[in-house]
């Protein structure tokens, strides 16, 4: 393999290792901060090197100029970056397969087109970030497009070799990927695609024509995927869909012994408790039975198993436990309290100890499910969400605490110097009212800062990617963290305050830019706090000179100039004008740098 490809993979692994400084008990504060700084500096250097490699070997290449040898080398490289057992870099694997698809189209090579349609669809699917029911699904349409085009070759199925036929069948089955499971109508649409694929997979004609194709495994995988409709059933009682899910669960329960293979797609690690869940939603057993099965599975999990199956057994299983435990009748809850607390502590320790390896996608999905299930449970799990953010990605937690401190600092100064700018916040409609409730407003400002980026816990594989610049497709996904945060915080009862801060913190003051797009204006009851948070967010992100490694920190003076240049458009005039006071600037500078050191030490020492 080209040595540049090997170097890129080595850089990936080194940057992941640098993300976790070698801290230890008794380590001096200055030494720990220096360790974090040095790691960030090395990561930045490696990122620049990796970007240069990618520019040379992928981004500068065009399909019309590729040779067969180069195409073969790129295909091998893509296989090293992504397969079902690991996920070194799904995004670059996708870019390679997209390039190879263009190459195959130019050559009019149908076999290669079908193969690359499959792999482009799969790698983009694993790049995508989705809510549990796929109601948020930014790349879903593109994913389905690849598979639907691949499935369209069924019309010429008999004319292809066995390998290509297998890809066509996989594309047909995968056409249901990325479909929403948010409503009964969504589930019916999913079932229509499911039934069409199963009609081919079960067909005596095709099985007789090509007996060596693993039809039974394909059927098993289809049933395993239909279990994803449990996400819909956790929100809605729907006997019709519940019976369909139970049908698949019973099939899997019967056939599981035949399908114990090293294939992450089959999710064998959780099919045991899927059966209990399906029976519960179909009214065949009490929720207590599901909780018992989950607890038994988690207690058996090896806390030192850091393989994909180990990650899922230790973390993803717990996410389901959060939901079903919350559905227990009140009189049954106390008997589980001690075991649940032990499981929670075990999962946090597991995340802290999880070595940086080639499974960032698996770990990211596990954290996503943990956070999402906690938010969906009818219990106040808000603090737990922060624990998972801390354990999963410490820089995000550092940033959140910094933004919380700075937002409160801005709001406190506005209440003192420009209280009229805070009128309307939290329903306090006069200057006198906002002054009387100043402490309450400051507490809310701090809380909004703490939780503004909670949506990033749904996409830690991107947030923690310091090995190269984000692809356009990945940036589209990252932009959805605001909407994810909004959904999560709405689910735990903060639709009117914290959720609004999460949703609007990247929206411009005048509503003419930023993201998410096409949102109504931020409600007046939270707008002044969101305005302060937006400035705090920009200032912390751009001035971090300790752990920030994807670009160099900017001088505060330059940033203040940028704030002033965008006053009234991106940033609120009332907040920007605070910097017109030299004394405020001096105090802010001290607050910024003292707080940053304190917060870094607090977060990184928690896991020593």
Region annotations inferred by a language model:
Residues 56-67, 100-114, 149-165, 198-217, ...:
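Flexible helix-coil transition and linker loops at the boundaries of alpha-helical arrays
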Residues 36-56, 83-102, 132-155, 182-207, ...:
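Helix-turn-helix repeat elements of alpha-solenoid scaffolds
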Residues 63-66, 85, 135, 306, ...:
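Non-transmembrane, amphipathic alpha-helical segments
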């Amino acid at each position: 393999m080209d040595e540049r490809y090997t170097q890129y993979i080595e850089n990936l692994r080194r940057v992941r290792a640098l993300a976790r400084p070698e801290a230890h008990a008794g380590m001096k504060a200055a030494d720990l901060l220096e360790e974090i700084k040095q790691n960030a500096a090395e990561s930045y250097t490696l990122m620049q090197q990796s970007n240069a490699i990618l520019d040379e070997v992928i981004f500068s290449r065009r399909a019309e100029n590729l040779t067969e040898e180069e195409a073969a080398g790129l295909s091998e490289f893509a296989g090293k970056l992504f397969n079902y057992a690991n996920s070194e870099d799904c995004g670059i694997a996708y870019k390679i397969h997209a390039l190879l698809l263009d190459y195959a189209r130019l050559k009019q090579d149908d076999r290669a087109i079908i193969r690359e349609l499959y792999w482009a669809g799969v790698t983009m699917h694993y790049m995508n970030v989705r809510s549990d029911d796929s109601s948020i699904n930014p790349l879903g349409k593109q994913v389905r497009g690849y598979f639907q085009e691949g499935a369209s070759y069924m019309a010429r199925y008999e004319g292809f070799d066995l390998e290509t036929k297998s890809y066509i069948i996989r594309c047909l089955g995968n056409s249901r990927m990325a479909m929403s499971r948010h409503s009964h109508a969504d589930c019916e649409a999913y079932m229509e695609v499911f039934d069409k694929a199963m009609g081919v997979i079960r067909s005596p004609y095709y099985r007789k024509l090509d007996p060596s194709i693993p039809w039974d495994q394909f059927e098993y995988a289809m049933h395993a995927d239909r279990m994803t409709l449990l996400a819909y059933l956790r929100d809605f009682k729907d006997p019709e869909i519940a019976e369909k899910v139970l049908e698949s669960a019973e099939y899997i329960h019967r056939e599981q012994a035949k399908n114990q293979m090293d294939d992450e797609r089959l999710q064998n690690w959780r099919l045991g408790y899927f059966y209990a869940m399906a029976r519960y939603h179909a009214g065949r057993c009490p929720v207590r039975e599901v909780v018992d099965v989950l607890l038994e599975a988690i207690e058996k999990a090896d806390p030192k198993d850091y393989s994909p199956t180990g990650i899922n057994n230790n973390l993803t299983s717990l996410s389901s436990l959060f939901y079903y435990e919350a559905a227990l009748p009140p009189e049954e809850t106390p008997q589980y309290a001690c075991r649940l607390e032990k499981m929670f502590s075990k999962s946090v320790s597991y995340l802290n100890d999880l070595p940086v390896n080639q499974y960032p996608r698996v770990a990211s999905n596990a954290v996503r499910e943990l956070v999402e299930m906690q938010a969906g449970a009818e219990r106040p799990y808000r603090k737990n969400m922060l624990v998972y953010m801390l354990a999963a990605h410490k820089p995000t937690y550092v940033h959140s605490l910094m933004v919380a401190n700075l937002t409160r600092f801005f709001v406190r100064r506005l209440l003192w110097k420009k209280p009229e700018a805070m009128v309307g916040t939290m329903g306090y409609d006069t200057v006198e009212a906002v002054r009387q409730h100043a402490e309450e407003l400051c507490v809310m400002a701090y809380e909004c800062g703490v939780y503004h980026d909670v949506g990033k816990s749904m996409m830690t594989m991107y947030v923690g990617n310091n090995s190269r610049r984000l692809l356009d497709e990945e940036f589209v996904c990252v932009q959805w963290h605001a909407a994810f945060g909004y959904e999560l915080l709405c689910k735990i009862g903060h639709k009117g305050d914290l959720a609004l801060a999460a949703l609007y913190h990247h929206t411009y003051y005048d509503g003419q830019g930023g993201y998410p797009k096409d949102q109504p204006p931020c409600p007046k009851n939270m707008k002044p706090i969101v305005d302060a948070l937006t400035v705090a967010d920009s200032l912390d992100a751009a001035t971090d000179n300790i752990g920030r490694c994807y670009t160099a920190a900017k001088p505060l003076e330059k940033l203040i100039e940028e704030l002033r240049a965008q006053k009234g458009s991106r940033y609120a005039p009332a907040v920007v004008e605070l910097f017109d006071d030299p004394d405020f600037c001096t105090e802010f500078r001290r607050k910024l740098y003292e707080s940053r050191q304190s917060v870094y030490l607090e977060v990184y020492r928690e896991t020593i």
